[in-house]
């Protein structure tokens, strides 16, 4: 089986459906994301569904290093755009509402933040990261209205398709909430990108790979893959120090990502293939802080294995097991 010429042409030589390529084809130039942090929280932090937050989460891991507390959307965009323009001569940006749960507030307040971002010079779209259990109808309608006016991605933090894992990491929601959120978002014709963490204790290789055919069946538009990594001042750090958490080596993770991509519908956009936090707050693995090194290792391994996204789609993907959750949910996605 050879890498199809049609995909080589469409993906400009890459062996997966890269988000950067999609943005460049859409806007005819490189587009950069500017991460934003506002005064939001999460329902598994404030006591609504749990306390303490996810066991792996320290929001400093995705907060800009030069973040100023209580800085406005405009101020954060100015700072981010200035840095990207100086470094890359960037002209176009996506405002990325990234930290905490960016739909967990009153719709009027959310709209103010979103529209403030859209008013910033050079912003060509929005990315809104949230939890699947924090999309009330009013907020979803607001986001759908904005999506008619701008380029927009709704990013849903699922992290695992297995309820036993979601419970262990203290997510405070289940797969059923995610399925409901995806269905309602797709009813509004929204682009949905799902976050998935690979490497949780208790999940086998097959458990992790089962997410690819699961996403195929749901018809999501994008996926972000993260390797499990341990951040300072988290519950996961305590488990790691007790020897209760084993992490992938870079080679192990690279092989898993390629196996995952081979099962994934080639139409699904790969927004990210690995995750990393600032070196100063990363406990392990050390290789994860070298983002470019991890990405290059994936690119080289794809070439070495003569592999590509969707190589075994749909044949092997269709035969993969459904997630081990509720029976009626398994039936719903088959």
Predicted regions and their residues:
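Hydrophobic faces of well-ordered beta-strands that scaffold small-molecule active sites
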Residues: 32-36, 93-95, 126-128, 152-156, ...
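Structural recognition of alpha->loop->beta junctions
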Residues: 54, 116-123, 210-224, 294-309
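Short amphipathic alpha-helices and their capping/turn segments at secondary-structure boundaries
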Residues: 80-84, 135-149, 209-219, 262
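Conserved C-terminal portion of the radical SAM core fold
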Residues: 176-235, 251-276
